[in-house]
Amino acid sequence: MALTSEQKKEILSSYGLHATDTGSPEAQIALLTKRIADLTEHLKVHKHDHHSRRGLLLLVGRRRRLIKYLSLIDVQRYRSLIERLGLRR
């Protein structure tokens, strides 16, 4: 299920650089993390949904590239975000 606009606003307000921030790496990574978590729960129930599994792999790859970009431009912001989201690195 897609994220509702209320869920997006909540995530963006807590992870964005300002209230209307949608383009910073932190905001994008936080939104992707929520979508990945939702899709992972879906796949636990629907094990044979291979189309959604491919979508999940694409989202994980996109998040990985954004995380790598953030680590290259600002290591402190990268470490802070990884800790806040609870991702392993």
UniProtKB/Swiss-Prot annotation:
It holds the Pfam family Ribosomal_S15. InterPro entries: Ribosomal_uS15 (IPR000589), Ribosomal_uS15_bac-type (IPR005290), uS15_NS1_RNA-bd_sf (IPR009068). Keywords: Ribonucleoprotein, Ribosomal protein, RNA-binding, rRNA-binding. Gene3D superfamilies: 6.10.250.3130, S15/NS1, RNA-binding. It comes from the Bacteria. The keyword Phosphoprotein does not apply. Belongs to the universal ribosomal protein uS15 family. This is Small ribosomal subunit protein uS15. It comes from Mycobacterium leprae (strain TN). The gene is rpsO.
